[in-house]
UniProtKB/Swiss-Prot annotation:
HEAT repeats lie at residues 879-917, 921-959, 962-1000, 1003-1041. This is MMS19 nucleotide excision repair protein homolog. It comes from the Eukaryota. GO terms for cellular component: cytoplasm; cytosolic [4Fe-4S] assembly targeting complex; MMXD complex; nucleus. Belongs to the MET18/MMS19 family. It is found in: Nucleus; Cytoplasm, Cytoskeleton, Spindle. Pfam families: MMS19_C, MMS19_N. One of its GO terms (biological process) is protein maturation. InterPro entries: ARM-like, ARM-type_fold, MMS19, MMS19_C, MMS19_N. Key component of the cytosolic iron-sulfur protein assembly (CIA) complex, a multiprotein complex that mediates the incorporation of iron-sulfur cluster into apoproteins specifically involved in DNA metabolism and genomic integrity. In the CIA complex, MMS19 acts as an adapter between early-acting CIA components and a subset of cellular target iron-sulfur proteins. Component of the CIA complex. Its main location: nucleus.
Length: 1043
């Protein structure tokens, strides 16, 4: 024990007299380990604490406080009581000791065994004996005071409330004059606790407001590389929570807000309006009443006069909050309706008459103000719409110019579109005892609104028609505003526009509107629109080349109509009842295209497939649609494509369903639908697809008239043969959930492997490889997967090692897709496969193909190995791949022959181009020399990929560019005259981006760049000239005032 005491005395001596700061940590460790106690430490410090030298006393208190900061949780109540008494006494000591005393009290304030009454005692001592103001204490000491307050408010709230207004007065004195942003955040937290936790403000309400509001509005801007990470937004939100926390501040805050809204500083205006909006959530109409005219005047002025969207948006938000607050007021028989009074001020004295002016100059700011007010509550929407909508309807009917009518209709749309606050409360009718339908504020104008919308849809003005579709959509979203007759009229108008309107903007708006209405009123579209679209799609075809030539523009026009009809069918098909009617129409188009009876083009067939895929997306949310695709659509697609593949060439007609582009368009239809299937249907789909492709089982296909011996996975010489249907097998089995077991998996993989390695057709062997990859990616780890991988990779290696083999490209394609499948799931074997790929970069025959293969590895695949298809895709796999392999790539580049270096550069550009921007910036210093080398490569693909990677990175002005600017400018300017248009455009974008670097860095290159840009300014391609003009404009202004 004596030895421990000697150790402690030694530590104290070295710290106090020897100025060895590290001994504080040793002392803390001794206390934590039980070698000695805190009270023993106090005893050991006795001589130091009673020294006549303030510095010596300060070192003693400093040691004790540092130990307490580490060991406060182990103190007993008695020890805490003794220490608090000691520290309170020390607050009266020399000022050099005060900082250490405050740190000790900060530690003690966190103790869970704080004795009763000690919290009050601590605060009284601080308020009486410490001058917290900025002139007296340093930043860290003031921070200690605020942290003590926060800790005690958390643990001893009731004791502090017992201090009453004395606590508020003490805090006000402490925070007065604070300017450090770190401490302000703490002070605002204390003030917020005072307000929100019900402390008695007493007679110090105004003082508390004054001591916090003096910082409003916040104009703090953090210095560059601020280590504390405090933002202006943090301070703004913290102060706003204080100022708007109690209605007792209203009489002081609202005049201040009015004053600050008149400021010339935009940020002050915006902050003031946002603060006013926050007031509306906590104040009642009583606090607002006196100041409403002044607030309204300021808001109106800013919305009418500002050119800033931020100021306008903040003003409208503030107005909406005020109206919402007034709407919550309870009406008494002997009091006026404050909401009605305020809205009368808004409507009659300022805004309403602007809607009726002949030139409609101020219609938009007036409309925005009125819409913000009306959208704030149900009561406000009642008052606003009853006053405004009749005037708008009258104006619309009295105007003859389409532009004015469009403006009025757009304004009307803002009032028709409901906001969450303007809807009536669920189950509560705000209009006496009427039904739910009558609760809509627009019921009284239902017929007039429909008449205006249908009239606008009948106009010839495209802008008016587009706006009318938006108003119609808004009306349809509110129950009861469209009667059955109105819905039918709307469908008829929309159908007419789809069939007749050639303006692309109108067509798009009509199709979108049709989709919205069809979701709510499917029966009307099934009975009225779909039959007409079907008739137009399947009739009126021109059959022969001569007839097409003679028809000219008429033929082109009918094709455009059919495209609109097909797009509309997809848009309206979000409900099962519509899908069951629309999808057969699209299937009928595919059937007609296959048989050749109507002469549909490949482009039209692809458009039909795209529409089917858009419909299939709804299967994710609607099981009935998914089941319909499983039962009807997918078997029909498989049957049609199989018929087309088996069709004899002697028939004189080659079905467009054998076209690779069409098959590629069918793949997402099937994969989207299969990915959404429920487990039972998914298992059945897997069994049917595998039995079809392995055994030729066509029993589940409609119109089953196929030969008895079908072998779709058998490699064929005919590129349009059944083997290309492997893409549909992939769509069926590789998009199913991972929990679905694929039957005959090993047998299927063997046949797919044979097809991928022996087929002479790129389309067939690529999709066979993708199918293998999709299955391998989802297969559980274990012996079965290892056996498959061993077999596949052995065959791939044999083919690749045989340089005379005619199937090396096929083997490489299989390798790259299997490598991707394993990379995505972090399989251990993926490292060996990527090493194999790196070794192939120097292959004279495959090198360029392998380099492009890295694009496959790093890019998202749209048809397989993606999350939509339930693939096993781990996060950040690209970053991991880059981290593990970038050094191998650089080493390979350095050791490669000059003729083969371009393959490494191309691979590098593909990898870097697909990395997240943050990773690119981090790795740029190491990779920039190689990227510059890539710009000198003769391969235009390498150039374009590298430029695509560089351009977004240059916008971030990375420091790594400082030493490489000369080389970068030389290469980029040379590429502005490249033979490839895309390379010229990309290099000009990079040159443009370089103009945004710090002026002192790029100013020396200005004359050189402007001279080099003369050639692309005269380029024969318009898009190149456009990029050159943009770049030259920035470089020309460089160095000029305001440039």
């Amino acid at each position: 024990m004596a030895a421990d005491n000697n150790v402690l005395l030694g530590l104290v001596e070295e710290f106090v007299s020897g100025q060895v700061d590290s001994k504080a940590a040793d002392t803390s460790t001794g206390v934590k380990n039980g070698q000695f106690t805190v009270l023993q430490l106090v005893e050991a410090l006795g001589v130091s604490l009673t020294s006549s030298q303030p510095q010596t006393r300060g070192r003693g208190v400093q040691l004790l406080s540092q130990v307490l900061q580490e060991c406060y949780s182990g103190l007993s109540e008695r020890e805490v009581e003794v220490l608090i008494a000691f520290y309170e006494n020390r607050l009266k000591d020399h000022y050099v000791i005060t900082p250490h005393v405050l740190r000790g009290l900060k530690a003690l304030a966190k103790c869970s065994v704080l004795p009763p009454g000690s919290a009050v005692s601590i605060l009284k001592s601080i308020f009486q004996d410490v001058h917290v103001q900025q002139q007296s204490l340093m930043v860290t000491e003031r921070s200690c005071v605020y942290n003590i307050l926060i800790s005690l408010m958390e643990s001893r709230e009731e004791e502090l409330k017992g201090l009453g207004a004395d606590f508020i007065f003490g805090f006000v004195q402490s925070v007065d004059g604070e300017r450090d942003p770190r401490n302000l955040l703490l002070a605002f937290q204390v003030a917020k606790n005072i307000i929100y936790r019900g402390y008695d403000l007493g007679k110090f309400v105004e003082e508390l407001f004054e001591v916090t509001s003096c910082y409003f509005p916040i104009d703090f801007s953090p210095p560059p590389n601020d280590p504390h990470g405090i933002t202006q937004e943090e301070l703004i939100l913290s102060l706003r929570a204080v100022l708007t926390g109690t209605p007792r501040f209203a009489e002081f805050l609202l005049p201040l807000i009015i004053e600050k809204m008149d400021s010339d500083v935009q940020s002050a205006k915006v902050d003031s309006m946002h603060t006013l909006a926050a007031c509306g959530q906590t104040y009642s109409h009583k606090e607002l009443a006196e100041f409403l005219p002044g607030l309204w005047s300021s808001i109106r002025r800013e919305v009418f006069q500002t050119a800033s969207e931020r100021v306008e948006s903040a003003g409208l938000s503030a107005l909406s909050s005020l109206v919402s607050c007034l709407s919550r007021s309870v009406l008494n028989s002997d009091s006026e309706d404050s909401l009605q009074v305020f809205l009368n001020l808004v409507l009659k004295s300022d805004c309403q008459h602007h809607l009726c002016e002949p030139d409609l100059k101020l219609v938009w700011p007036s409309a925005k103000l009125l819409q913000a007010a009306a959208g704030a509550s149900y009561r406000a929407s009642l008052i606003g719409t009853q006053a405004v909508i009749p005037a708008l309807l009258d104006q619309y009917n009295n105007r003859t110019q389409c532009a004015q009518r469009r403006t009025l209709l757009e304004v009307l749309q803002g009032f028709v579109q409901p906001t969450p606050l303007s809807r009536p409360a669920d189950g509560v009718s705000c209009i006496s005892t009427h039904t739910h339908e009558e609760e809509s504020v627009l019921v009284a104008f239902q017929q007039s609104l429909c008449t205006v919308v249908f009239s606008a849809l009948s106009e010839t003005s495209a802008g008016l028609q587009v706006t009318a579709t938006r108003v119609l959509t808004a009306l349809s979203q509110q129950p009861g505003l469209l009667s059955q007759t109105d819905v039918e009229n709307a469908v008829d108008h929309l159908t007419r526009l789809i069939l007749e309107e050639e303006e692309a903007q109108v067509s798009l708006a009509v199709v979108e509107c049709s989709g919205s209405l069809a979701h709510l009123h499917p029966h009307a579209f099934v009975s009225r629109m779909i039959p007409q679209l079907k008739e137009k799609i399947l009739s009126g075809r021109v059959h022969t080349v001569m007839e097409k030539t003679l028809s000219g523009s008429l033929y082109e026009c009918s094709g455009a109509v059919r495209r609109r009809c097909v797009a509309a069918l997809a848009s309206v098909s979000s409900q099962p009842s519509v899908v069951q009617e629309s999808s057969p129409v699209l299937l009928q188009v595919l059937t007609s295209a296959h048989t050749g009876c109507c002469g549909f083009s490949v482009e039209e067939v692809i458009a039909v497939c795209i529409s089917l895929q858009r419909i299939a997306v709804h299967a994710r949310d609607n099981e009935a649609i998914g089941q319909f695709f499983h039962d009807i659509i997918i078997p029909r697609l498989l049957g049609l494509t199989l018929q087309a593949a088996l069709q004899s060439k002697d028939s004189g007609h080659i079905s467009p369903l054998t076209d690779e582009a069409v098959l590629s368009a069918i793949v997402p239809v099937i994969s989207t639908a299969c990915a959404a299937l429920k487990p039972e249907s998914a298992s059945r789909m897997a069994a049917q697809a595998v039995s079809l492709f392995l055994d030729g089982d066509t029993s589940f296909l409609p119109e089953n008239a196929f030969p008895s011996q079908i072998q779709p996975l058998q490699s064929q010489a005919d590129s349009r043969g059944p083997s290309q249907l492997v893409c549909l097998l992939m769509a069926c089995v590789c998009s199913l959930p991972r929990s679905v077991e694929i039957p005959d998996m090993d047998r299927l993989l063997v046949q797919l492997e044979d097809l991928s390695c022996t087929s002479p057709h790129l389309f067939s062997y690529t999709f066979a490889s993708k199918c293998i990859a999709g299955l391998v990616n989802k297969r559980p780890a274990g012996a079965a997967l290892n056996a498959v991988l061993d077999r596949v990779l052995k065959r791939v290696s044999l083919e690749l090692e045989e340089t005379s083999s005619t199937h090396r490209t096929q083997a490489f394609t299989l390798l790259i897709w299997v490598a991707k499948a394993l990379l995505l799931r972090y399989h251990p074997l993926s490292t060996a496969l990527t090493d194999k790929l790196f070794s192939l970069l120097s292959d004279s025959a495959l090198g360029s193909l392998v380099a492009d293969g890295f694009c496959v590895l790093m890019n998202d695949s749209p048809d397989v190995l993606n999350r939509d298809c339930h693939a096993d895709v781990r996060i950040m796999y690209r970053q991991r791949f880059f981290t593990e392999n970038s050094s191998k790539l650089v080493q390979g580049f350095n050791s490669a022959e000059q003729a083969k270096k371009s393959c490494y550069l191309k691979a590098l550009s593909h990898i870097v181009n697909n990395l997240p921007r943050e990773v690119q910036l981090t790795e740029l210093p190491a990779l920039l020399p190689l990227l510059l080398e890539a710009l000198s490569c003769v391969d235009q693909g390498v150039q374009l990929s590298t430029l695509s990677c560089l351009q977004p990175v240059l916008l971030e002005s990375p420091a790594a560019l400082n030493t490489q600017l000369e080389a970068l400018f030389t290469r980029l300017l040379a590429l502005t005259t490249s033979p490839a248009m895309k390379v010229r455009m990309a290099s000009l974008r990079c040159v443009h981006a370089l103009s945004r670097l710090p002026e002192h860095m790029v100013m020396p290159f200005r004359a050189r760049v402007l001279k080099a840009l003369a050639a692309p300014l005269d380029d024969k391609k318009r898009l190149v000239r456009k990029e050159a003009v943009a770049a030259r404009g920035e470089w020309f202004l460089l160095g000029s005032p305001g440039g």
